[in-house]
């Protein structure tokens, strides 16, 4: 009995030394509960990400495993290196940009697309190492940051509606309503409403519940074939290490690479600041302890993610659900990472999820991201016009890159045209000029 108590005390002592639980006013039990809570809110990514990257021609079974691995790697590294209750996983939005635009619309091999993700992540890593990253966040106006986030939300929402069959291509009107009497369309819409209703009732696993319910209903209707629950992890050799670094390192993909870098910069940095602020760790300027370590983990996770065959990795805002139940240290993130490793053995379940079951999650994420438009000052046209252009041009041009480019250019035009030059930061002007050069010398040829 005394040996058991000694072992338990030793384990608690190690956790205290690594995570400083008492200093953060928490306990191991609270951190574990917080880890489970965060995991339940974001585990949907292991079902949705393979569906999206499968559009690019990637092996969905292999992507399922690499999604679990990179989520585990990033989350555990964040917990141990930065001691923050923030989990990481492949970014929603950038995965859709990669699959639907870079590969499908631009016609590039997915290996080249992964190369673009890699170079964007390397750029982000360099910005982090040389401390330029936080300077960019501080100097790019809220209207453009919100426009980018909301535009990606509209883009994801459109992809969700398309995958559910709610909207279909129409040569006369571009898009039109699909067959709303089709059971797959109805199940896709049902999945979205399940998420919306459960989330409004503060049920953390709303997305997971929706995917399970719609998949079960699909199975009852014959769309889904039962392949078991537990199995050895599928091989990942078809996706790991197939990144085309040489083919993607060219001027023609500069805009795509920059888009991956810029979006990941805003997405992850904003999430880190938001979650740490909710945990009471950030100061009034948005700075938090071990910020440099957290930004480094975020960057290196994206570099690693491209090599193992998954899209850009980012900090997940769902981490705030774990914070809401008491998560304050990196132990929360480590628990999330361990749970992602365990999920690897549930690959048959991931293979059963039909596209319309994942569509509801896409639409819901679109809603969450688009809601940030409320932060725009709509009374000031020099701020609202660029935000609007940035947001709507992403789905309408079917390109996140073009939306970002036009947003920065319009921002400069509006400020110069109204004589408000003091509102222009060097960062915004430089980015806008780079996009103008891209349009004139690259896109025009």
Positions of PLM-derived features:
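Short helix-coil transition sites and intra-membrane helix breaks within transmembrane domains
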Residues: 40-44, 81-91, 126-127, 202-203, ...
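Juxtamembrane transmembrane-helix boundary signature
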Residues: 2-3, 71-92
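Membrane-embedded alpha-helical modules
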Residues: 106-216, 220, 334-445
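Loop-to-helix transition at the N-terminal end of transmembrane alpha-helices
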Residues: 56-76
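Helix-loop-helix hairpins and the membrane-proximal interhelical loops
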Residues: 2-62, 175-177, 208-292, 433-437
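Helix-coil boundary and interhelical linker segments in multi-pass alpha-helical membrane proteins
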Residues: 51-63, 101-112, 251-254, 354, ...
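Helix-loop-helix junctions within the multi-pass membrane cores of secondary transporters/permeases
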Residues: 11-45, 49, 70, 91-149, ...
């Amino acid at each position: 009995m005394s040996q058991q108590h000694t072992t338990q005390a030793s384990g608690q002592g190690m956790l205290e030394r690594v995570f400083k639980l008492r200093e953060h006013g928490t306990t191991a039990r609270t951190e574990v509960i917080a880890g489970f809570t965060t995991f339940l809110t974001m585990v949907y990514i292991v079902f949705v990400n393979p569906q999206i990257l499968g559009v690019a021609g990637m092996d969905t079974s292999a992507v399922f495993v690499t999604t679990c691995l990179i989520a585990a790697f990033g989350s555990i590294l964040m917990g141990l290196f930065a001691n923050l209750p923030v989990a990481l996983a492949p970014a929603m939005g950038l995965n859709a940009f990669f699959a639907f635009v870079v590969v499908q619309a631009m016609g590039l091999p997915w290996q080249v697309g992964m190369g673009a993700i890699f170079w964007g992540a390397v750029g982000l890593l360099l910005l982090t190492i040389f401390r330029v990253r936080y300077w960019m966040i501080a100097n790019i106006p809220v209207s453009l940051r919100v426009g980018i986030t909301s535009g990606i939300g509209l883009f994801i929402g459109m992809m969700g509606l398309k995958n559910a069959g709610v909207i279909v291509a129409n040569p006369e009107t571009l898009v039109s309503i699909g067959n709303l009497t089709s059971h797959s369309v109805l199940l896709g819409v049902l999945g979205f409403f399940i998420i919306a209703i459960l989330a409004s009732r503060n049920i953390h696993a709303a997305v997971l519940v929706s995917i399970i319910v719609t998949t079960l209903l699909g199975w009852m209707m014959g769309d889904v074939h039962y392949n078991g629950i537990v199995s050895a992890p599928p091989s990942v050799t078809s996706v790991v290490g197939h990144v085309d670094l040489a083919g993607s390192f060219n001027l023609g993909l500069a805009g795509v690479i920059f888009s991956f870098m810029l979006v990941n910069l805003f997405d992850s940095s904003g999430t880190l600041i938001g979650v740490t602020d909710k945990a009471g760790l950030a100061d009034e300027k948005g700075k938090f302890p071990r910020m440099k370590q957290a930004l480094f983990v975020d960057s290196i996770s994206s570099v690693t993610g491209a090599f193992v065959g998954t899209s850009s990795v980012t900090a997940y805002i769902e981490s705030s659900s774990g914070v809401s139940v008491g998560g304050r240290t990196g132990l929360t993130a480590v628990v999330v990472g361990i749970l992602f490793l365990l999920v690897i053995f549930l690959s048959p379940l991931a293979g059963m999820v039909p596209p319309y079951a994942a569509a509801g999650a896409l639409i819901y994420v679109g809603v969450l991201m688009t809601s940030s438009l409320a932060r725009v000052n709509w009374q000031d046209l020099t701020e609202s016009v660029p935000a609007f252009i940035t947001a709507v041009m992403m789905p309408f041009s079917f390109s996140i890159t073009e939306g970002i480019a036009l947003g920065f250019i319009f921002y400069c035009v509006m400020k110069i045209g109204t004589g408000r030059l003091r509102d222009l930061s060097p960062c915004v002007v430089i980015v806008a000029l780079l996009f103008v050069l891209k349009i004139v010398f690259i896109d025009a040829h």
